[in-house]
Curated annotation (Swiss-Prot):
Name of the featured protein: Aspartate 1-decarboxylase
Keywords tagged on the record: Autocatalytic cleavage, Cytoplasm, Decarboxylase, Lyase, Pantothenate biosynthesis, Pyruvate, Schiff base, Zymogen
Principal location listed in the UniProt entry: cytoplasm
Gene designation: panD
Gene Ontology biological-process entries: alanine biosynthetic process; pantothenate biosynthetic process
Catalytic residues identified in the record: 25 (schiff-base intermediate with substrate), 58 (proton donor)
């Protein structure tokens, strides 16, 4: 049996752009993708902390060190520049793999620069 588990997360990133006329997806600074173990074109879930919207799309690698978080296409209707989002990828793991699995949780500052990388979130943690 396989279970769907958190693979990587970019926690509380600030939306820098929203481009309605782009074909689709989310553009993310390549440094953030690497740190979270998320690949270009990988399916991700997005949560908008400002309005509660949850949606799925895929990633496009943005310029390294740019801090870019840009929602493209229809997803641009669900965010505004300055909104705080959580970007999550998931992995399929077998029961034996679960015990050794540690997700990569990337904590960022207000400029989308890496503040810390953790693998465990205790209950009721405020980050």
């Amino acid at each position: 049996m396989f279970r769907t588990m958190l693979g990587g997360k970019i926690h509380r990133a600030t939306v820098t752009e929203a481009d309605l006329n782009y074909v689709g997806s989310i553009t993310v600074d390549q440094d953030l993708l690497d740190a979270a173990g998320i690949y270009p074109n990988e399916k991700v879930a997005i949560v908008n902390n400002n309005n509660g919207e949850r949606f799925e799309t895929y990633t496009i690698a943005g310029k390294r060190g740019s801090g870019v978080i840009c929602l493209n296409g229809a997803a641009a209707r669900l965010v505004q520049k300055g909104d705080i989002v959580i970007i999550m990828s998931y992995v399929q793991l077998s029961e034996p793999e679960i015990a050794a699995h540690e997700p990569k949780v990337v904590l960022v500052d207000g400029n989308n620069k890496i503040r810390d990388i953790i693998s465990y979130e205790p209950p009721h943690t405020v980050l």
